[in-house]
């Protein structure tokens, strides 16, 4: 269970031997307490930016396709999608079974499919078979859907701002110490304490590497890529 914004701030304040924040005063604090709030935000943002595919940022989206519409926007806080996961859901009423979409480049859609999709107008063509990155902030399907099919896919979320005392970070609470080290680094930088900030930065970087080792650098098999001559 991730820790709340208030809990993280108070952990940092205890490390500094400063007065903790009362929840009712959280929105209006000043001085060092306000600096700690900013430092915790910066620490959370840095961890989220360190990797595209943190497992704790994994999410799943369900969209209902619109007849005759090929392109759609990403959900809020979207970072990166798993294009292998896009699947039309089975629906006996629509006469469709589970269908995994094949990824194509946007240029391929432009060259081979867009004209037919656009020519179909508001009627669409059939069950989509392809998925592609749209121009801008979204994705596209082809052929143009002729019914309101349900599409599911998996993606990773970006950093979402924390503002209220009860907001949570999505980062597991077992790594609160990493967040605290990051907050101390930013706090000491605010205060121009270079020696203390450097020590906290090193601890913060080690903590991020530990997170990467645990969650990212985890291979189930190794493939030999040597070429035989």
Task: Label every PLM stretch briefly.
Residues 1-229:
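Glycine-enriched, solvent-exposed interface loops adjoining structured elements
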């Amino acid at each position: 269970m991730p820790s709340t914004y208030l809990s993280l701030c108070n952990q940092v304040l205890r490390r500094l031997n400063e007065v903790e924040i009362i929840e009712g005063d959280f929105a209006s604090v000043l001085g060092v307490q306000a600096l700690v709030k900013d430092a915790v935000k910066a620490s959370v943002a840095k961890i989220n930016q360190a990797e595209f595919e943190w497992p704790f940022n994994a999410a799943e989206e369900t969209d209902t396709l619109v007849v005759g519409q090929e392109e759609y926007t990403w959900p809020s806080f979207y970072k990166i999608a798993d294009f292998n996961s896009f699947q039309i859901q089975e629906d006996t009423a629509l006469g469709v079974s589970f269908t995994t979409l094949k990824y194509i480049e946007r240029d391929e859609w432009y060259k081979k499919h867009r004209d037919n999709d656009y020519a179909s107008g508001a009627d669409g063509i059939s069950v989509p078979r392809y998925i592609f990155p749209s121009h801008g902030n979204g994705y596209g399907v082809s052929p143009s859907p002729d019914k309101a099919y349900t599409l599911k896919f998996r993606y990773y979320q970006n950093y979402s701002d924390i503002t209220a005392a009860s907001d949570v970070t999505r980062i597991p609470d077992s790594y609160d110490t990493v967040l605290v080290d990051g907050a101390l680094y930013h706090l000491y930088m605010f205060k121009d304490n270079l020696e203390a900030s450097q020590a906290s930065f090193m601890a913060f970087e080690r903590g991020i590497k530990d997170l990467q080792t645990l969650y990212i650098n985890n291979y189930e098999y190794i493939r030999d890529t040597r070429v035989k001559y």
